[in-house]
Each structure stands twice: as C-alpha cells, then as structure tokens.
C-alpha cells in the first residue's frame, strides 16, 4: 500500500516540506501517513503575505462564508474526501478507523 502524504497548506497552496512526521498505528507501529511540517521561519515568511489571504476573504460575504463552511462540514461528515496527494479517497468510516488506530481512542469516543 502506498502511504499517503499530507502536505502543509501555505496560503491555500499545498506544500511538501522536507520536515515530515510519521503518523503511526499505536498498536503495531505501522505508518498510516506522513505529514509535512513547517518551522517558525516558514510561518513568519507566510505572515508577511497574510494581507493577500485577508483580501481574498474580504471579497466574500458573510453568507457566502457560512455557506462554504456548511458545505465543508457536510462533506467532512458524509463525503469521501481526498487523502494526501495521490488522489486516494477516504470515507467517513475510514477516517474514524484511522483516527482511532493512531490516537488509541475507541471508535465510540472518536465518533462523538
């Protein structure tokens, strides 16, 4: 199985960092995914361009932002969403199982 990689988002763009962390199954230590991470220097550099992000958000009305958030919440709860960069889809049930296996929480606690 190809291990998915979860990139960082930098001003809305995917960014694969050299600094990566493995997300492991707490029971057997198998790697479920890798995640890019950025350091404070990268965050500071991005903050110098934060006005572009603010300007993009200001172009949307409050109603549009609420609608976007509502749709995102519905997709998160019910949709099959892309996992990582390779286009593989993850169902809500797959997400619960992965979160349970990497956090050690029982499925019932994760689902709350």
Model-derived features: positions:
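N-terminal Rossmann-like NAD(P)+-binding subdomain of aldehyde/semialdehyde dehydrogenases
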Residues: 1-112
């Amino acid at each position: 199985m190809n291990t998915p990689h979860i990139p960082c988002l930098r001003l809305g763009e995917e960014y694969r960092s050299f600094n990566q962390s493995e997300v492991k199954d707490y029971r057997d230590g198998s790697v479920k995914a890798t995640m890019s991470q950025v350091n404070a220097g990268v965050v500071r550099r991005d903050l110098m361009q934060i006005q572009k992000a603010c300007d993009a958000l200001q172009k949307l009305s409050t109603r549009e932002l609420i609608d976007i958030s509502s749709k995102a919440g519905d997709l998160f709860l019910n949709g099959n969403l892309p996992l990582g960069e390779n286009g593989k889809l993850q169902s809500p049930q797959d997400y619960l199982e992965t979160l349970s296996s990497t956090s050690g929480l029982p499925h019932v606690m994760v689902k709350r």
